Amino acid sequence: MSDTRIERDSMGELQVPAQALYGAQTQRAVDNFPISGQRMPAQFIRALLLAKSAAAKANVELEQLTTEQGGAIVKAVEQLLADDFLQHFPVDIFQTGSGTSSNMNANEVIATLASRVLGDAVNANDHVNCGQSSNDIIPTTIHVSAALALHEQLLPALRHLVQVIDTKAAQVHHHVKTGRTHLMDAMPVRMSQVLGGWSAQIQGAQGHLEMTLPSLQSLAQGGTAVGTGINAHPQFAAGFACQLSRLTGVEFVPGENLFALIGSQDTAVALSGQLKTTAVALMKIANDLRWMNSGPLAGLGEIELQALQPGSSIMPGKVNPVIPEATAMVAAQVIGNDATIAIAGQSGNFELNVMLPVIARNLLESIELMANASRLLADKAIASFKVNESKLHEALSRNPILVTALNPIIGYLKAAEIAKTAYRQGRPVIDVALEHTELTRSQLEVLLDPEKLTAGGI
């Protein structure tokens, strides 16, 4: 038995692996683009398959396909989604900029399975791709896959991170530490205030991501080749959105201007910008954890992160902050992905953006990476760290910046003199203030109480 079979397309005959579900156009793409070895993301292929099912159902309702043809296409998609469908989608990310190769890959695979279901020929172009163009189905799939990934992965992960931070903040509320600006000693803060800042950052990022959902759920489908809707039924866009909403449980609607949705990727660029904002917040939190955990003897040593693995192949006993480090690398990757998406978003020359596959890949990678990193940061770093109270107390007792609380009483210059003397002599600020002011020790103990200073005011 031969390892290959002959398939035909508009360019002629081509050898295709005998057991492959795809046909000639997919094989041409495999041959043309041996670039990265990276396939389109699973979330993207899943969304593309769901879109094909929704299209078939809409076309049956609009009498563009027979009930049998549409049913066979829907059944084929169900079979793929229930199986290891990625093995049937070998096309490289770096392919034709419209994503036509991935669209035809889906059309051919579905057509093969649907033909088996129907017992008659289902055509990849005429039936599976009915009323569609790569130029609207791929932008649509980018929106759908990103919206589903936000709903299913990233937003739940960020909510979990906020919940863990808030729970930890309540647990460490009684701990007061030296605040730092410019990495230099500053006025005291509660540990709960530090974590409260983190929580607010993540909640803000979450809110900004949610604001992109209405635009993501607005689809290019129905615009076909250039936005005019040529060869699509006038009611196809609405029918497609309705069917897709039923399939996914997410409300999708036809876009108001299909020319904009096909010729640009502004929504993807906007979403990527908010993903970058979220990445910056995660980077800040990761770095705060690393600094507070630094030491254990020669660093700040304010907290102790959970020990997860040996930290060195040469230094016995060394343990490193691996989860914050991994999170920081994820943040760096997301920031880099955003730069690529911004450049790709500029490539909407006239009626079509021609960097769609790399936009899809980077967008979905950013969402997945941050969803996974957020949960790890929550569960393996924030939830389990321990506070080193003795280190906090030692640093606070020697912090000359506490004298800031005396500014309204003795003035800035006098307070600065006391701070410098305390620092130079390595003495507690309260002892130096006792010598340089007329305030009593009991008064100074009240005025310089770190816990009270965390409340602000005069």
Which role fits each region the language model picked out?
Residues 1-458:
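Conserved, well-structured ligand/cofactor-binding cores
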